[in-house]
Every structure is written in structure tokens, then in C-alpha cells.
């Protein structure tokens, strides 16, 4: 019984204790998961700050660019201009060129015309005629330019102007494989329509397409354009039916479809680029609803259709749009493509465009050697597709990897570099807070991104801005003077050819240290006496010689003038003494004797002319009361002042008619040992 009982206890302990091993594992896994989450948070924080900084710099450079990227050596392909005309340029030709421009005001500009080539109007509910003329297999298209003007104070709504640009017969449900490209109808809209004399009154421009189709409606709802031979067109139609635009004859009905596209929005931005367009048309009902209650809807069999099904079921208008200078040129401008995504495939688009181009155009593109044609067709040249993805590293471990993309845009500043070498060079020079390593890939490239621990993130701006008021420091609009720094960086080294090998990771494993090449321009100096920051324009003057700037002299004089408990003579002596001490830099008690004797030598004649000798003596006595000067210094100063007075004999004769002193007493230079003046009667 004992063994059985023991085994039962063991089994019971297994049954009841089966949780203990799993709880131990969970207790081990839980800290590991928390550690991974903490590491991931540190990874996000490490990449968050530089990304926010570069996003801010991107926005600021869009508003006030510091440099033009097309001027950089590795971005030369962004510069579409050439310097060929500089060799033959002459200053004397400027006047003739300006006069020629004024003499030909109607010369077409680069985008003088908006050309619309209509491929066809597609509608499944309309049956084409089988035994009729070609013009009965078409619909009438009217294009209007809608100008939405700014609302005035008295207007309830924005005034709208509709300018008709033309009417065309557009093929109805054409077969594009059997139709010649040159047979498509075309319409031109001059750019003068978009830039009138009062363009400031127009807020936005739109194109309004209005398609009208006449035919018979069968019981199934389809419209047929078959003509009835028994209809007598000479029969008179009642006036009431004439006013009804939807009825043209017995059983005939007219349907009108409209669509509107914005050319320039309210911010004057172009919305319609060169390309192929397919517009969903909306049918206008026979009984129009009030404009205030009108809504755009697409209804079929009582059910609302998704937007993409509208292009397969509802009526659509296909056309090709391009901006051209020569309306007689049948060639098609390069089609502007949107930003390519990771799944973009341009082969189908290119083949579709080539089917719509005339045959002579391809020959023209291949043999044309003009600069303008090369510029126009360069964006459409087939180039190798590169799939680029970024791999973010933190603590030498891969933390995150982006999806592969086909474009060469910088992820931080969205700059289109157009070439892989230019992208890597831009990332290395413009985003040096990160370290980028290029890793070749069979289908493209992989760029490893890690934090640059050696980056000097100290403040490199104007050091005076730190000590200035916040509102004033960053309110300047133009360049300011910086501290002069002279460094010889490099002396025109031989430029190496662009190669992707310079972006590969170094074999020694040490990351490249991004160091600052220029230093010293953000160094800040201070005045030795006032401890105020020294401005760059004050660097040429020694701060030790700036004890008495003009503003400080004026301030001292103004403060003394505000005293009310002293007379004018005492104010004058105080002004002279304070300016004298400031100019010579006397700051210690033991310098007062020297300051007094120097003051007599410099300002003695002025004191004698203004009869301020008594006031000066009172000033020396005041200094003696504070133990700044001795009686011997007072004796020497007054004796020297007496010698200066005796050296001006003409001064005595000129002063007899004047008041003797500021206090109304004549002054003799005799004094006692206690510094008190003795008045001698004449």
C-alpha cells in the first residue's frame, strides 16, 4: 500500500503541479519580451529626433532654400540649362533682345496652348448605328472654361464665368485598335484665357465638358441612333415641344452628360499635367434639381456603384492633354507620371502611349538632335528599374526594414535624386546624423542606416542669438556678419570619378567619422569689463579700449543732470570727474591720488575758465572724508591748479566782469590743513 500511495502522491503532484514548469518558462520569457520592447522603444527614440530635425529642415528649405541642388556636382543632371550661349554672349545684345521681345508680344511661349485630343466617348447603354454615316456615330462635345472669381462684399456667392472654347464631334464607342491616331478631334485653349488683365479677380480655372447625344430609347433603356425613314422632318413641331430640349422628334431623346476638371486651383497651382485622362461623366436629368440640393451620384438599377465600377459601366470621356508651344506640331509631349510605388510597372503605360502616337513622331524623336527635344524626351527614356529598400540598424542588429520602392527620392527631404550615386551622396552629405552603407542587391540596392555616434550636434548657429531676445534672435530676413575664420581646407584635389564603391562599408569595421571641417565661426567672446557678449562687428576693436563708449557717456551725463540736491557747479565737476575716471579706467582706491593729479592736468584749464575751483576743492575734501586721498594730495592738486591759473594772465582780465564763482564768491587758493578754504577780501 505504501508504494501505491507514494505513486499516487507523485501522480497527484504531477497533476497539480503541471503549471509550475510553464510558469517558470513564462517568468523567463516575460522579462525577455519586456527587454525587447524596451530596446525597440530606444531604437525608435534614437531615430525619431534626427528624423524630426531633417523633416523641419526640409520644410524650411522649401520656403527659404539655402542652396540649389542643381548646382551641386553630383546633382548636375538636375540642371537642364546649358552654358553654350555664354561664349557668344555680348552686353550690347541685351538691348536688341529686349526690343525684339517687345516687338513680338504675340509670340507663343513654351506653354502657350492647352491641347486636348479626344479619343472617344464610351457609354454601354448607347448602341452605335450600323447603316448610317460616320457623323451619326459620334456625339457633340462642348468644352467651356469656367472661371470662379473672388466674391465681393455684396455678392452672396462667388461669381462664375463660362467661356466657350469650342465644339467637337467625338467618336462614340470607337475601336482604338482600328482607329488612326491622327483622326482624333483636337481642341486648343490658349494660355491667354488663364492670364487675363484682371487675373487677380479670378480664383480658379476649370474645364467643363458637356456631351450631348440624340437617339431613340428602347423599352430596355438603351438608346439607339438608328434613323426612322418614315419620319417626316417637315412636319411642324408644336411650340411646347420646341421648348423641350429633350425631345427632338417622335420617340427621339437627347441626353446630356457633364464633367468638370480643375486646371488651376485657388493657390494658382497647375492640376492638369501632360498625360492621358478618362473622365466619368454625369447625366443631367430632364427635371433639374435646385443647385443648393444637387449631389453627385451614380445610380444603376437602384443601387449605388463603387467609384471604379463607374468607369466600366457609366459614360466616360477619354482624351489626351498636353501643353504645347506649336499647335501645328502633331507630336505628343512626354506624359507626366505620378510618384512610382513599389508595385509600379511602366511597361504597360509606355506601350499604351506608343499606340496613340503617330508613326512619324517616333522617327522624329529618334533623329532629332535639338536641345529642346532632348530636354523634353529625357524623362521618358527607358532606364533600369532599381528596387531600393532601407534597413535600420541599432546596436548592430536589424530593427526595421522598409518595403522596396522604385523611386530615388530621399526619405527625409523627398528630394528626387534621379540616380543611385546622387542619392547616396546626398544622404551622406545632407543627413550626416546617420551613417549610410550601400549594399549591392541583384534587383537594386540595400542601404543600411545607423546612428552616427560621432556626429557633433553642438550649436553651430550665430552665438549672439543665444543671448538675444527670443523674438529678435530669429526674426532676421537676410544674412548677418559672422566671426571671421580663416582655414585652408583643401587645394583643388583631383576629383575622382563617381563610384558606388565609396559608399560600401569599410573593411576594418570602423564607421566613418563625420567631423566638422570648419570651426571657430561659432566662437563667442565677451567684454572684459561688462562681461557682455561681443558682437562680430565689434571684433576689430579691442574691448580693453572701450571703457567709455558714447552711449555710456551720454547716460552718465543724463543721470547727473537729474540730480536736484546739488547746484550747477557741482554737477559740472561731477560730469568731468566721472567721465575722467571712466576713460582712464581708475577702479581702485590707491589710484585716486593719481587720478586727482591727472584730472588737474587735463581738466584744469576748463575748471579755471568756468570758475569751478571751489567746487573742485569741495570734491577733493569729499574724497578725503572717505579716505580716498590724503591732505598732501589735496595740497599738490590745488598748488598745481594755482600754477595753471597763473599761466593764463589774460584769463584774470577777462573774468573781472563775470561772476566770481557759481556760489557768488571769489575764490582764493589758500586753504588750511583741514581742507577748508579761507576767503580773502580784496
Swiss-Prot record:
Give the span(s) annotated as VEFS-box.
523-599
Cellular component GO terms held in the UniProt record: ESC/E(Z) complex; nucleus; RSC-type complex
**Transferase keyword on record:** no
Where are the C2H2-type Zn fingers located? 408-431
Region Disordered, annotated ranges:
326-355
Instruction: Identify the keywords attached in UniProt to this record, alphabetized.
Output: Chromatin regulator, Metal-binding, Nucleus, Repressor, Transcription, Transcription regulation, Zinc, Zinc-finger
Q: Which Pfam family, giving just one, matches this sequence?
A: VEFS-Box
Give the InterPro entries listed for this entry. Polycomb_protein_VEFS-Box
Its GO biological process annotations read: chromatin organization
Q: Residue ranges under compositional bias (Polar residues)? A: 340-354
Annotated compartments: Nucleus
Q: Which domain of life is it from?
A: Eukaryota
The GO molecular function terms of this record are: chromatin DNA binding; zinc ion binding
Where is it chiefly localized?
A: nucleus
Q: Which PANTHER family match?
A: POLYCOMB GROUP PROTEIN, POLYCOMB PROTEIN SUZ12
Describe, as the record does, how this protein assembles with itself and its partners: Component of the prc2/eed-ezh2 complex.
State what this protein does.
Polycomb group (PcG) protein. Component of the prc2/eed-ezh2 complex, which methylates 'Lys-9' and 'Lys-27' of histone H3, leading to transcriptional repression of the affected target gene.
Similarity comment: Belongs to the VEFS (VRN2-EMF2-FIS2-SU(Z)12) family.
Q: What is this protein called?
A: Polycomb protein suz12-B
Amino acid at each position: 500500500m505504501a508504494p501505491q500511495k507514494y505513486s499516487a502522491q507523485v501522480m497527484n503532484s504531477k497533476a497539480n503541479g503541471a503549471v509550475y514548469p510553464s510558469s517558470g518558462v513564462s517568468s523567463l520569457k516575460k522579462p525577455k519580451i519586456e527587454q525587447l520592447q524596451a530596446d525597440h522603444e530606444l531604437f525608435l527614440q534614437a531615430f525619431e529626433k534626427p528624423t524630426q530635425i531633417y523633416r523641419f529642415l526640409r520644410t524650411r528649405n522649401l520656403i527659404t532654400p539655402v542652396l540649389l541642388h542643381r548646382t551641386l556636382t553630383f546633382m548636375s543632371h538636375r540642371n537642364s540649362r546649358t552654358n553654350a550661349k555664354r561664349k557668344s554672349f555680348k552686353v550690347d545684345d541685351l538691348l536688341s533682345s529686349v526690343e525684339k521681345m517687345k516687338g513680338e508680344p504675340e509670340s507663343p511661349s513654351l506653354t502657350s496652348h492647352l491641347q486636348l485630343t479626344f479619343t472617344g466617348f464610351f457609354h454601354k447603354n448607347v448602341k452605335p448605328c450600323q447603316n448610317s454615316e460616320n457623323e451619326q456615330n459620334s456625339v457633340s462635345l462642348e468644352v467651356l472654361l469656367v472661371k470662379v472669381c473672388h466674391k465681393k462684399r455684396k455678392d452672396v456667392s462667388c461669381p462664375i464665368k463660362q467661356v466657350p472654347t469650342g465644339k467637337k464631334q467625338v467618336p462614340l464607342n470607337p475601336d482604338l485598335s482600328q482607329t488612326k491616331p491622327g483622326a482624333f478631334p483636337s481642341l486648343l485653349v490658349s494660355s491667354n484665357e488663364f492670364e487675363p488683365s484682371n487675373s487677380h479677380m479670378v480664383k480658379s480655372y476649370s474645364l467643363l465638358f458637356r456631351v450631348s447625344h440624340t437617339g431613340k430609347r428602347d423599352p430596355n433603356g438603351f438608346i439607339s441612333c438608328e434613323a426612322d425613314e418614315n419620319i417626316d422632318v417637315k412636319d411642324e413641331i408644336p411650340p411646347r415641344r420646341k421648348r423641350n430640349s429633350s425631345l427632338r422628334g417622335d420617340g427621339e431623346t437627347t441626353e446630356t452628360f457633364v464633367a468638370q476638371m480643375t486646371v488651376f486651383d485657388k493657390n494658382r497651382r497647375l492640376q492638369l499635367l501632360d498625360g492621358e485622362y478618362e473622365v466619368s461623366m454625369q447625366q443631367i436629368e430632364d427635371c433639374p434639381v435646385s443647385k443648393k440640393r444637387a449631389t453627385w451620384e451614380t445610380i444603376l438599377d437602384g443601387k449605388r456603384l463603387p467609384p471604379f465600377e463607374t468607369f466600366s459601366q457609366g459614360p466616360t470621356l477619354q482624351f489626351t492633354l498636353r501643353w504645347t508651344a506649336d499647335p501645328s506640331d502633331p507630336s505628343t509631349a512626354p506624359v507626366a507620371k505620378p510618384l512610382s510605388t513599389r508595385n509600379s510597372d511602366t511597361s504597360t503605360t509606355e506601350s499604351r502611349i506608343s499606340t496613340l502616337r503617330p508613326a512619324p513622331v517616333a522617327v522624329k524623336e529618334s533623329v532629332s538632335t535639338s536641345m529642346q527635344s532632348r530636354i523634353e524626351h529625357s524623362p521618358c527614356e527607358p532606364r533600369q528599374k532599381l528596387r531600393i529598400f532601407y534597413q535600420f540598424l541599432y546596436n548592430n542588429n536589424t530593427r526595421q526594414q522598409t518595403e522596396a520602392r522604385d523611386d530615388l527620392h530621399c526619405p527625409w527631404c523627398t528630394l528626387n535624386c534621379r540616380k543611385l550615386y546622387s542619392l547616396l551622396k546626398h544622404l551622406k552629405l545632407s543627413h550626416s546624423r546617420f551613417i549610410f552603407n550601400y549594399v549591392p542587391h541583384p534587383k537594386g540596392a540595400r542601404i543600411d542606416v545607423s546612428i552616427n555616434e560621432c556626429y557633433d550636434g553642438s550649436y553651430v548657429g550665430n552665438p549672439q542669438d543665444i543671448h538675444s531676445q527670443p523674438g529678435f534672435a530669429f526674426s532676421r530676413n537676410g544674412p548677418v556678419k559672422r566671426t571671421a575664420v580663416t582655414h585652408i581646407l583643401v587645394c583643388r584635389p583631383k576629383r575622382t570619378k563617381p563610384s558606388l564603391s565609396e559608399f560600401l562599408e569599410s573593411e576594418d569595421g570602423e564607421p566613418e567619422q563625420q567631423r566638422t571641417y570648419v570651426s571657430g565661426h561659432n566662437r563667442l567672446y565677451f567684454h572684459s569689463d561688462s562681461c557682455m557678449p561681443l558682437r562680430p562687428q565689434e571684433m576689430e576693436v579691442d574691448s580693453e579700449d572701450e571703457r567709455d563708449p558714447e552711449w555710456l557717456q551720454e547716460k552718465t551725463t543724463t543721470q547727473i543732470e537729474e540730480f536736484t540736491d546739488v547746484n550747477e557747479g557741482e554737477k559740472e565737476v561731477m560730469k568731468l570727474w566721472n567721465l575722467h575716471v571712466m576713460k582712464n579706467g581708475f577702479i581702485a582706491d590707491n589710484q585716486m591720488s593719481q587720478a586727482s593729479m591727472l584730472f588737474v592736468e587735463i581738466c584744469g584749464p576748463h575748471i579755471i575758465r568756468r570758475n569751478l575751483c571751489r567746487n573742485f576743492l569741495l570734491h577733493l575734501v569729499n574724497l578725503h572724508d572717505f579716505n580716498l586721498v590724503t591732505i598732501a594730495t589735496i595740497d599738490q592738486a590745488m598748488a598745481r591748479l594755482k600754477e595753471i591759473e597763473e599761466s593764463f594772465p589774460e584769463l584774470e582780465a577777462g573774468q573781472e566782469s563775470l561772476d566770481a564763482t557759481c556760489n557768488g564768491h571769489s575764490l582764493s587758493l589758500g586753504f588750511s590743513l583741514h581742507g577748508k578754504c579761507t576767503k580773502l577780501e580784496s
